[in-house]
Amino acid sequence: MAFVALPAGAQDTPAPAKMTAQQDHQQMMDQLHITSLRPGADGNHPQAPNAANYDEAKANPYPKLPDPLVLKNGKKVKSAKVWWSKRRPEIVEDFDREVYGRVPKATPKVTWEVTGTTQEKNGDVPVVVKKLVGHVDNSAYPAIAVNIDLTLTTPANASAPVPVIMEFGFVFPAGRRMPPPPAGSGLPWQQQVLAKGWGYAILIPGSVQADNGAGLTEGIIGLVNKVQPRKPDDWGALRAWAWGASRALDYFETEKAVDARRVGIEGLSRYGKAAIVTMAYDQRFAIGFVASSGEGGAKLHRRNYGEIVENLAGSGEYHWMAGNFIKYGGPLNWNDLPVDSHELVALCAPRPVFISAGAFKGDAWVDAKGMFLAAVGAGPVYKLLGKKDLGTTEMPPIETALTDGEVAFRQHSGGHTAGPNWPTFLEWASRYLGGA
């Protein structure tokens, strides 16, 4: 019989309490004194009573958005100083409390270990691939281990530290793979990045926090909470994934191959949501590529088009958000939210952010126009800080890039993918990240 030595204190630590997502969702509703929620939009059955709306004439029940440049006391923000010292903190507080949740003040230290280094070729470019694990200090609660999975790839022939684009990477179950890119879509995005002389990194969000409500007593949230259920303003998975990206950037600041001042963040779909949350909260990230992020990402919460607030308030997706967000799918409505996603984009200012969407066929759920309008709504903040906005308030034709300013937008003709927008993003990003 083999015996395994446990860390000091582990023998006295109870195993994580197992709750289903439905049970955890219900206990959060109980904390909030909510007895019922409105159903989310049904994207699969057009005849359902709660079928997703795709009629633009019905898409704007609340056309008036919160003004990002008006303080809570009603005074207008007329200077960058007042934005940074007063208005921006107000917006951050609202997102913390009501939308994404608060990161605890004392999160555990992460110690990075290089577990493997190989010399390879990606396409015809010699590269150095480093496999890394970020060991999260679990001495306060040894029953939960969190080890962040990160891979860094840099050009082997670089003569100086290079910019890096970090992606929140998908991991598919055995037997499933990411759908292949459409025919004629060009080089894989990694090879396009390498062609610029830059590096890329892939962070696995599930190694930081599970993508389900049952996992809230595991991962970094479960570790910090010592298995106890979340409070209504505790962080959800999107903030946890963003926290993981920030810890990866901590490592890049020590990595000689990387210019940590020129690190971008990219993500698609739920990881597009995580990418813009990362950009908004960590000002060290130089640039963002936010692809098909939809509701909970760059899409306006006040839009009735495709996925809506009620979807994220339900038991399938609530774990992405703060518990308090559930209120807006039940007793409160979208217009009661103190903020909207144009202010999330504004939190990225003055740094450049690229909002990406696909065509109606294949990507209608994420509401391309709702994301465009959020980019428009962030424009006044960018201009206040001396940067360029989108340059128009009119939704452009498909495949028309709006890339003259620090807020950029393009709707490609593909489906739910970032792929067709990579060349446009990289050309635009070169203005800010420069060469290797």
Language model: regions and residue ranges:
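Mobile cap/lid helix-loop segments that gate and shape the active-site cleft of serine hydrolases
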Residues: I220, I287-L344, D367-E394
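N-terminal pre-domain segments of enzymes
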Residues: Q11-G101
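N-terminal cap/lid segment of alpha/beta-hydrolase-fold proteins
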Residues: A80-K81, S85-P89, Y100-P163
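Primarily recognizes the serine-hydrolase "nucleophile elbow" in alpha/beta-hydrolase
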Residues: F172-P181, S246-E310, G316-E317, N324-G329, ...
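N-terminal signal peptide c-region/cleavage motif recognized by signal peptidases
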Residues: A5-P7
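Cap/lid segment of the alpha/beta-hydrolase catalytic domain
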Residues: A160-R261, G294-R303
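C-terminal catalytic histidine-bearing segment of alpha/beta-hydrolase fold enzymes
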Residues: W320, K369, A374-A436
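Conserved strand-to-loop "acid loop" that flanks and positions the catalytic carboxylate
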Residues: A349-A368, H412-G414
